[in-house]
Amino acid sequence: MQTIAEILSKELNETLPHVQNVIELLDGGNTVPFIARYRKEMHGSMDDQQIRKLADRLTYLRNLDARRSEIKQSIASQEKLTGELSAKLDGAATLAELEDLYRPYKPKRTTRASIAKEKGLMPLAAKLLLQEPAADPVKLAEKYVNPGKGVNTPDEALSGARDIIAERLSDSADIRRYIKELAHRSGAITASRAADAPEDNGVYDMYFDFSEGLSTIPGYRVLAINRGEKEGFLKVSVNIPEEGAERIVALSVVRGSCPCSKQVEAAAKDAWSRLIYPSVTRELRSMLTDEACEQAIATFAVNLKPLLMQPPVKGMVTMGLDPGYRTGCKVAVVDETGKVLDTAVIYPAPPHNKIAEAERIVTGLIKKHNVKVISIGNGTAGRETEKFAADTVKGTDVKYVIVSEAGASVYSASKLGAEEFPDYDVSLRSAVSIARRLQDPLAELVKIDPKSIGVGQYQHDMPQKRLDETLEGVVEDCVNSVGVDLNTASVSLLSHVSGINSTVAKNIVAYREAEGAFRSRKELLKVPKLGAKAYEQCAGFLRVPESAEMLDNTAVHPESYRAAKSLLLLCGSDISKLPDELKRIGMDKAAEECGIGVPTLKDIIRELQKPGRDPRDELPKPLLRSDVMEMSDLVPGMELTGTVRNIVDFGAFVDIGVHQDGLVHISRICDKFIRHPSEVLKPGDIVTVWVLEVDQKKKRISLTMKKER
């Protein structure tokens, strides 16, 4: 039997020592960002996503082993654990396979078969299974008639014996495996309109007469069908070829055509229709749902990461507009660091239409604070607010950007929002958040539950614990990839740093408020509850620009300061000479002299050449706009530049500046075949698109990224 490390090595195509090292590091309480960044020599430079995948599979395989042990103990206690069965259990690669093998030995609630066994009909079932040509089933059954046990006639005895045979067939791991293989090859999931379905608004139209193969149906359709069934619109079933399934069951047990064989054949048909079909279809649907959820969670993660990693718009005084109709549009002006300078409420949209007054207020704030860019939320009244802003800044150098306001209202009404802005109305907090989202998306978005950011499909239908764990991993990876300024970071941002929990994050901020700015990374050890292990995990991801130690403002870990200083000595503290010096002595020799591995050496060189490097600066900046377009302005063939807002399994939604995102179907993203849009696109990408079709009535815009030739 393979060890877990050997299984993972084969699955992930990583060397066994590297896998063993990662397992040891994880078991030692090291975080994924720390392992990925500062232990590269131990795992061959696996990235954070690869390590998380390994950690996920490690948990699954350990749970599998634990369940295997439980099952073996249970069967052994029944004195039924044979060498052959033990080997089969050892060979089971999934929990489903394990449970199928355990079915015959699993304690059951009362069933028709268990009642028949209590009536003493097991020997009759065994005799029927012998299928002796000369045997008469009725005469065999007469011996088991016992009114005292509730067996009044030979027919009742035969019925009970068939129930025992049917359950035995239903519990066969081999039969269940063959049926599932048949279902995967030839089965389909079907949906139709439920008899008592409520009035439909068109959402489930395509599923009222629907059938698709189990092996080909995409995950998003599985989740849509599940939701339609849950809401009472759809009746859903799994179709498995009945003739083929019955043949599989019968061939496993029926021999010949004697009278006893007819009884066994009847039991086989009953096993299929009454026991195997309902059970297997439940399993198949559960499996489809699990796979669909994993795919949807992965898509959510793919969308979330680039949203968090959007390049900040630095060094600009920013105005945030939170649009609204009746309650007005909330305005907040923040300086280059995100500090609130001014707030106001304007009413440019219906029913008030106080456009002139709103223009006067906004123009005054722009001049007073030298506002350079306006950040506009894309929610209710966003269209009218965008037009108002475009008209107001026309002829000036002020630009505007539409930002997603998803989650802003959640933050503004949260305990965190109240603590940060106790004197501001909830709606004004939203305007501040919208302004800050443009200045530093990561620092602002970490204050919000990732599920509220609005980039997932069917997120409420997914296992919430699994979704939370995955999204938290994405947030953690992003925060640690960028690094955090120890003297300006909020509790929310600090709590996502490797090795720091919310309690320690609060203690860091409390220490900062009491003692003033941190003057070095080493000072972190004075923070209550931040011990040596936490310091090891977090220090490299925290920056202290004010420190006398230059390396404290880089991603170089304190454990590598001596190596970094040895490197500086090599080039006489002139970083520009370092490449020539390294070429002269060689990377391997330099690493050896510094007492580190080559991967760590390369990371240190990168940091010394660009101290304070922000990986977000290398990504495309948000599109700044100065005018507005209407949907009616669009015509087929028109070329536009847009921003990818969201990735879904069937395509990508692109903001082209008309307040209604257009859809680029997966087939129109590129010329080569792709399985998923995320292979070539991510949220935040700036793309060139062409208009294919505009449906004003349904508010739908179809786009293509493939220029028509």
Where are these regions (language model features)?
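Structured, non-catalytic alpha/beta "coupling" segments that mediate domain-domain communication
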Residues: 74, 99-102, 228-241, 251-276, ...
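Single-stranded RNA-binding regions, centering on S1/OB-family and related RNA-binding modules
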Residues: 544-709
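Long, highly charged, low-complexity intrinsically disordered interaction regions
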Residues: 4, 56, 62-80, 90, ...
